[in-house]
């Protein structure tokens, strides 16, 4: 009887460990390192019909690892291009 009880406890602990490992990976437990998009010179951050300015574009480019951004109007669309990788 004692042997069966300890075998059940080992099985329960094994299942618990497997469950924690699987749920930890699916919930992003491995997100310790941030995923960064490689810095590509001239990357288009957004392309939209709203008006834009180079200041607004630059404010959006800085958190993505760039030093500046420029706003160009092409075919009545505002295109924000990031430049000067950090």
Swiss-Prot record:
The cysteines joined by S-S bonds are 39-85, 52-71, 57-80, 61-82
Q: In the UniProt record, does the keyword Transcription occur?
A: no
**Keyword annotations from UniProtKB, A to Z:** Antimicrobial, Disulfide bond, Fungicide, Plant defense, Secreted, Signal
Keyword set includes Disulfide bond: yes
Annotated GO biological process: defense response to fungus; killing of cells of another organism
| Signal peptide segment | 1-28
Q: Which GO terms describe its cellular component?
A: extracellular region
- Source species, domain of life: Eukaryota
Cellular location of this protein? Answer: Secreted
What family does the database annotate? Belongs to the DEFL family.
Q: What is this protein called?
A: Putative defensin-like protein 189
